[in-house]
């Protein structure tokens, strides 16, 4: 009997991405405190740790499952850029990103219960924002779209209009690197195909 697949996430984007490939899964909110910007830890360590916390929390209740967790951060000049606190903060973040490259890191953790076997991985993509105007920033922020997103933009929505180019995995930038997730699941004997 195949184990239930559980996505440990509150993210509408991760839910959509996993749903779009047509597999059956259950969404469970992990309710964990995520680690944010830290001078002592790298973005790789932070996203891996946050993804792992999510699957471990959900594993407390689901003892016969494959549990998927993920975390994504935006990094500019070595600094983690989180979700904006308010519209003013979103404008500030988007001005900092304007006409520059930044990196997006996503950590993915997959746990099989009851064995508690865990695999983790981190994917990095590079994004170049275009030289958009202050007026474009204000119009974009007024849509409300950037308010729940690391880096204050959503590449899968209107935020795509702010991006000049990407290098790497598009789905990583959205928040769930599907190809890497599939390779982790393959090691448990599962496939997204």
UniProtKB/Swiss-Prot annotation:
Q: Does the keyword Hydrolase apply?
A: yes
Q: Which GO terms describe its cellular component?
A: cytoplasm
The cellular location(s) given in this protein's UniProt record come to: Cytoplasm
Site for Important for substrate specificity, residues: 13, 72, 156
The reaction(s) catalysed by this protein are: dTTP + H2O = dTMP + diphosphate + H(+); UTP + H2O = UMP + diphosphate + H(+)
Task: List its EC numbers.
Answer: 3.6.1.9
Keywords, A to Z, come to: Cytoplasm, Hydrolase, Nucleotide metabolism
Q: Which family is annotated?
A: Belongs to the Maf family. YhdE subfamily.
According to UniProt, the name of this protein is dTTP/UTP pyrophosphatase
Give the originating organism.
Dictyoglomus turgidum (strain DSM 6724 / Z-1310)
């Amino acid at each position: 009997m195949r184990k239930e697949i559980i996505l440990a996430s509150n993210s509408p984007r991760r839910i959509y991405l996993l749903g779009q490939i047509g597999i059956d899964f259950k969404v469970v909110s992990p309710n964990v405190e995520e680690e944010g910007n830290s001078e002592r830890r790298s973005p790789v360590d932070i996203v891996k740790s946050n993804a792992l916390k999510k699957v471990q929390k959900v594993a407390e209740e689901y003892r016969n499952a494959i549990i998927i967790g993920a975390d994504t951060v935006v990094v500019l000049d070595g600094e983690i850029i989180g979700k904006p606190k308010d519209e003013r903060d979103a404008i500030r973040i988007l001005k900092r990103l304007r006409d520059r490259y930044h990196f997006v890191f996503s950590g993915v953790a997959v746990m099989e219960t009851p064995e508690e076997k865990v695999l983790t991985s981190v994917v990095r993509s590079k994004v170049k924002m275009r030289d958009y105007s202050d007026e474009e920033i204000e119009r974009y922020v007024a849509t409300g779209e950037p308010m729940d997103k690391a880096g204050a933009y959503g590449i899968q929505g209107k935020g795509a209009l702010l991006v000049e180019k990407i290098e790497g995995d598009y789905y990583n930038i959205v928040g769930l690197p599907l190809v890497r997730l599939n390779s982790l699941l393959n090691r448990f004997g599962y496939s997204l195909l």
